[in-house]
A protein has these predicted regions:
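Conserved loop->alpha-helix
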Residues: 1-149
Length: 149
């Protein structure tokens, strides 16, 4: 489980097709406390750490995950919003984010609104009916409150 509060921005250092897509992601996390098998949200997608070094970790991205996300995201040099999994006792500042992707959205507008920004999104098909005013969504792993539908 995650909160949608981004704690680092990583960069894909290498991408290699090994059955699944193996990514090596450079990051600023102290990975000494990250076990193999731990979950890290990569732009909102819950992925499992399969290897690691001092300043990088590796994950395998399934074809199903690639097909349900913005597929150009999974390329060498791409930046990813990162969040370690929620631990008991951590501050809970966003909303519950599972990291299981339901679909994608197209950004159709971006405008300043007071001290923040208003983002217009177009969501295809069934997913749009699941979004409620004043509910929450995660966009690239970032917790956002829905103002209106």
């Amino acid at each position: 489980m995650f909160t949608g509060i981004i704690t680092d921005i990583g960069r894909i250092e290498a991408a290699e097709q090994k059955g699944d897509l193996r990514l090596r992601i450079g990051c600023g996390y102290d990975l000494s406390g990250v076990d193999l098998g731990a979950s890290i949200a990569c732009s909102g997608v819950c992925l499992t750490v399969v290897d690691k070094g001092d300043d990088w970790f590796a994950v395998d991205v399934s074809a199903e995950t690639v097909s349900r996300t913005a597929s150009d995201r999974w390329r060498e040099g791409a930046r990813l919003n990162l969040e370690r999994s929620l631990r008991l006792g951590d501050e809970f500042g966003g909303h519950i984010v599972t990291g299981h992707i339901d679909g994608t959205a197209e950004i159709i507008g971006l405008a300043p609104h007071g001290g923040s920004n208003r983002i217009g999104l177009r969501v295809a098909g069934e997913l749009g009916r699941s979004i409620a005013p004043k509910g929450s969504i995660a966009l690239d792993g970032v917790s956002l409150t829905v103002n209106d539908v």
